Amino acid sequence: MALLSPSLSPAITIKEIDLSGVAPNVSTSVGAFVGNFRWGPVNSRTLVADESGLVRVFAAPNEDNAVDFHSASYFLKYTNALYVVRGNNGGQNAHSSWNALRNAVDSDGAVTTDIVVESREDWDTVNKSAYNNDSGNSGAFIAKYPGALGNALTVSFCPAFDSDGTNHFDNWSYKGSFDREPTTSQYALDHNATKDEMHIAIIDRTGLFTGTPGSVLETFPHLSVAKGAVTPDGSPNYFKDVLDNQSEYVWAGALADDSAFGASFANIGQYWGTLPDVDSATDFSTGTSAWTDAVSKLRLGGGVNSQDLTNSQITTGFDLFDDAETIQVDFLIPPQSSTDSDAVTIANYLNGIAKDRKDCVVPVSPHRNGIVGVSTANANTNAIAFANDLSNSSYLIVDNNYLKVFDKYNDQYIYIPANSSTAGIMAATDYVAAPWFSPAGQRRGNYLSITDIAHSPNKTQRDALYKANVNPIANIPGVGIVLYGDKTHELRPSAFDRINVRRLFIGIEKSIAQAAKNILFEFNDEFTRAEFVNVVEPLLREIQGRRGITDFKVVCDETNNTPAVVDRNEFVASMFIKPARSINFVTLNFVAVRTGVDFEEVVGTV
């Protein structure tokens, strides 16, 4: 191609030039929560859309973790996107050698059966080499995640008929869940081997997962016990690979160490887990003659639930959300903490993340001991003291209450921090109005599906709370339980001391920042500046038309892109915005005038 023309000789050249850039729509309703759950991956982000999804991944709560579970589930009553991170403090995985090894101790007298596999990443990078190599003490199968819930699992297997011709399949309890007996796979035939297939069933022995004891949770038909086996289409078919990749309940551990199998692979086939030997025509059923239906049912045990999470474990979970470029999130929702000082520590830590990201807010509630079970006056004092210990920040949003909700899983009433529902109200405001509308008041600020609140402050108490930048949650006669304030924790008088303004600017900044990526590495000239202005102004006009701002001005010209700025390879644009203000105080003047007075004479005088 020539320097100044598209061709050195006469020709027709077609070019497409795209000047249709717009400021993109951005999400404003995604939450992030770290808590203690009975099941599920640890220190890994999982996006859930509703309560049923929360149960499916993290299991229904018991009494120990009901508060954290319902804190997450109540946010999902208002919206449909919550990243959940499970923390772990001492939780251990159940495994199939728990009974034989539960009394084993090391040289220091410590129990040696502790197994902790927290997530797929943890398994792949650390634990697989320790527990999957047939030389550890994990047993043949390990529960997928830490927790006593894994003790409800049983893994049952059925090998191919043995060399004596015994058809194990006919004597197996779970034959009805499979189409036919296991035989020889195509992989084995291709490698001059026989009888390598095996069926595996994962059973909910006690009914803790499904509510029905003995339910079949998963089935894996026609797996191969030959190491490295694949299906005709090239997919892994070695039973350890399949379980590791597909099972939601177990990992495949060390076969040789499981007491149910005995030493040296007795009762399971002495060639299981080996490569087929083409020269010797491997018969993978060798050694399975002692198989029985009872022997096939490997009960998992030794699983231990997590204790209450420490500050370090909670903050480690939230560290997964510290990079705004890799994960989109709008609310960082802290769980209930162990002490008042812990609640302050976590709130201030999350505020630091929010201020670094500049695209999310942190709704927080005081510690439970200062709110539940104390007088309303003391609760008010404690809420204000809690707020006074927090950092000054427009990214913090403080409320004063706990919500009384019904825990249907444990048939009890519990109190949960209000902050997750406060975040939910803000997310719901995005759907019914826009982020720049106040979430407070009877139009948008009602709390859903709650029985009561710990305290309902009166007018005087609400005044004291609001002065301390604490948003009261109150039971207002004729209205219900509502968020009765829309302040951030910005203590300096500012437009950013209101939630709607903070969230307005978050939305605008995110959208325009995305649009600005299109001008990176372009020339800082009049054309590029005009292109940028033509992208930004329609966005601001639309927000103005939807009542988010009253006026604006975009400056992006030679006045702020001086020759010095251009020579530094910089680009400067300034957006001047007058945000809409929510009504916090209403004054109604009722003026009596004499009969003969013209209203024009008195209007404006009072």
Model-predicted regions and their roles:
Residues 1-112, 139-140, 144, 194, ...:
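Structured, hydrophobic secondary-structure cores that serve as assembly/anchoring elements
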Residues 52-58, 70-73, 91-93, 100-233, ...:
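Extended, beta-strand-rich, solvent-exposed assembly scaffolds of outer structural proteins
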